[in-house]
């Protein structure tokens, strides 16, 4: 086909215009011009062409020829050069008449082969592929094939490809399964313009150009075809065309005197040298014209001659591949394919030079956002070449590609290493790109380091928002699963940005464990191709042998660098969309354009090391020069400042699923942070060397994201101080990360695995985290950290804005902070907002790190609590005493119970989730936003809860150490919070099984279940609780828009609502609300839970154990979801407690609940009394656990909002609310006013979580629960029950709380459906009238359009409307839902909710005067036996069924029967 297509070109080979095919009608005049063709062939070609032309045209041509004959040679040459090339109008009309021309087919064929590649785990919507092809044709002026013809060619190119219909009901699309866009686009071969060769060479130059145009693969394919044909004709096998040619010559089938024959015979023995360039040229022309001729010409000799010439040409190409100096030039592309580097050197340098130019062709892909410049990803690190695997990940760093292209051809295409490779970078070889990796600035020492995991899948997701087509690219070191990038995501500790980072071999251990800088710069957008081209990361580790291997977590510092690029990308995206205003301030407008060129330097200072920390600090300096053109980090970070996230209307307006711009970017950034955190923890586990890493990051800000994302969109300079202490116990004061750049915010994630304090001062992020080298958490260290952090926040007002994070009170940090403020001249509030978002990201990152099993010793980013300085700044102060005491107790309990699980309990937090991974709690705060996406995918059910991390500041108002609480919750919630973002925005398609799965429906053609979700829901769901295929109602609810109510395909759904009205079922449904929330993030965790349940069927399994195993299960299933795991652990604990509380429900159900609130809630759906209890407990737990309440509060202000709902609703309507949240939207106000304050109180009481929670819950619950009590009777009741149960096993309940929060959060997402909201209102103030509640929720929804509400939240209205929140409870919930509906529904919602929480009066949420615990307990007991409560539960069930939860009831019924 190639030859036929090239028929026109042969006519003008001498014209040196091989690229554009000349009009065929010019061919008649040209035969004489084709000296390469023998007379017979030329005449045959002429005759063939003449026959295809009508008589009138022939006569015209004859007339023209007569005129031309009068011209002089010079005039003829001029005429020839003036002949138009390309398709003439007449030809186009002819083509339209025809179904398709060979040229069109070849264009389509080449486009498909150059643009798409097989990838078993991805699918591409057919329409998108065709649309891209059409735009490609439009850009080049080709006539596109019809969709049907294109589909046929697709089948020819990918014979193994199958069509699938993916998507939710009513939104499904037909997809090509097993395909993905290429991560690297091969440079199109341009004609060779080097004529400085011998006569032979000159002749060969043109052919070489033509050969280049003929893809090497095409040539090899043609050779195979020729050999096959020859074997049939000559009945003799030929392995190569050369063999065939020699056979033809020897057998005298063709003349032996021709130059080609002599060349073949001479070259055959010599191997390569025999072939001459001229011969190559002749065959080229001949083959082009001859193949058709073979059919046309009757004489076998002609056919054989053509065949021979073609063979000769092929032979030449092959020889060129082999080191043939003369031919290597002509066939350099081929040589590149084989051993491009070696051959190229042999070949003429001149030829090579053109190829580097060709690399720039990357621009050609521009029509196709998928940047396929394999060069960049591959080239990033020499290791990368060996790591060909990394390339397969499809790091789509369009920006990077562009950047590298701009920087130097070498970076993009391996030009220096293998110029030939550029063109020859055939699909088979592109992944290798080993040598060029070096060319790219980044060198990754550890192959694993470079994870462009998300890119392939992400790309698919990205489509929704083209702004960040690179979203997928976001490198989530942590098994993102794209986040965009998420896919992704190899948990491999090292996540290298597409740019890749060079890390010292010394640092390798660190790098291996995710210390690798994960640069998202490539991921943010393809559009930012112009951004800085390359990321140079130099890691100069100063290693102290003193360090204990166990405490080698320090390397995570390296990971910080990647964050910056990510942030930058996000920023750029924001700039494109519009200036993003911090939600809080809304004042700060950063011009994205300026950011683009800026290089942010993130300097990590190890200055502030605690004396103890200095024990063995391994300091490695990482200079991360990141040209992060687009940092997707931008908006999502802002979730804490919900407004800022969606501030950018463009970003916000994106489809809710794919809030790519802000959400995705943010998502991506968090993934970066997360990976960093994870890497840190991984490094810790791997025993990497401790030490603070200094990073000099130059990050061109694609655009500064104002507001929460970077929170500090200050100057491009960011200094990150991270110090780790050998003594993990001591907080790393010195490990304060000061990030002045919003982009650097990502760096905030504590790099030091042992201890990290990340402080965000102004835009500076101070990450203070203490992580144990051992898996166990050291309460003392935490206390110290908390104190240090507190001091810092106290000392610096600016920091106070960031006070959410406990910032070590180091003068250096303060100075940094101040300096940052001064430098930036940014309002502290803005910074505070940014910090908040950053903190969230950091938190999430930590959680993510936690979620990775490897990071039991997550550095605690306790400091990362973003003091949502906006409105909740006052809440941010840590209660050191409470935090320390409770942390110690809780940590002990949690460690014991969840030591195996990486439940990232925040040490400072009330220890609610304190588990072996005490670090996590802090991390969720800062990582929250960034990690959000990560987390979401990691842990669907945990998602909502995590979101609150940023918000925690407001929530914890009553407690001096609200941050810990929020962080604690973040531990469990951060995941959920992030998850939503991550899932929706970042990994919509397949980023994470969980996160993705929920969000996938919205933004992606992929199935609801994301890759994270291990097996099908059927496999995952608890055998007892028959969950719908979605397996997590919460999952569906979370992405209500995207996912319809879980379909009950998996099991019969004959149950009637009446049955579900059983009292226990009613209670369970109240729990279901929770569960649904959990369900939101439950899918993955739910599956894990289910599996766990399968493993632990006994109904009375020890709650701690049960949830622990489940937790682990989570970790196993979602390495990146590990943070979720803790949440799930908490939730599981609560559920277990519920079980203990006296529901003798089959273990599987309990396990469901226990495993994960979400899971449990799902189970609850299958209405098992135990599950209901669990749900109730979960709801209650959230409140009881003081930490969790904070987290909840955080959710309101931030993406955590849903979680806030969980808390508030949980508190007031723990059971009903959870259901309601999903089915009925309980007004945020109601939730906040009643249960929430109690929850907060609980959180405040860190000392003895159980006692404190009980006491606080009691007093608060008295007011709120009783007042709300009737409203949220179910939830109150549940909350009390949960509280009591949780209090009994404090470790368990803390675990449960986060889950509940998550559940709540999920239900919030569910909010989108008004009916759901209404149901939630079943908790509606004492009146449990579903109808009224529905009206309220509907009104709230009406008031807040999802998208508009998201935008409002992003704009900062939510934060500002703190008091409004109370009045707007329902609307806020709706907002949350609406946020969720926008691209990052969950994240957005959380962010909106969090903002609301932030703005909320702390007293509303958590009345310091009230003690929730006691009241809760009493109320729970009362509710348990309260007919009104039961009625409410039943009503909520009914409303749920009415609102489309009939499937749940159906599910529940069989489950109920089974349970009965």
Swiss-Prot record:
Its Gene Ontology cellular component terms are: chromatin; nucleus
What functional role does this protein have?
A: Transcription factor. Acts as a transcriptional activator by binding to promoter regions of target genes, such as PDCD4, PIK3IP1, MXD4, PNRC1, and RFX5. Plays a role in natural killer (NK) cell maintenance and immunity. May play a role in the process of ciliogenesis in the neural tube and neural tube closure.
The protein's name is: DNA-binding protein RFX7
Residue interval(s) of motif PxLPxI/L motif: 188-193
What illness does the record link it to? Intellectual developmental disorder, autosomal dominant 71, with behavioral abnormalities: An autosomal dominant neurodevelopmental disorder characterized by global developmental delay, hypotonia, speech delay, and impaired intellectual development. Most patients manifest neurobehavioral features including autism spectrum disorder and attention-deficit/hyperactivity disorder. Other frequent features include hypersensitivity to sensory stimuli and sleep problems.
Q: What is the lineage of its organism?
A: Eukaryota, Metazoa, Chordata, Craniata, Vertebrata
Q: Which organism is it from?
A: Homo sapiens
Q: How does it assemble?
A: Interacts (via PxLPxI/L motif) with RFXANK (via ankyrin repeats). Interacts (via PxLPxI/L motif) with ANKRA2 (via ankyrin repeats).
Mind telling me which PROSITE patterns this protein's record contains? RFX_DBD
The compartments listed are: Nucleus
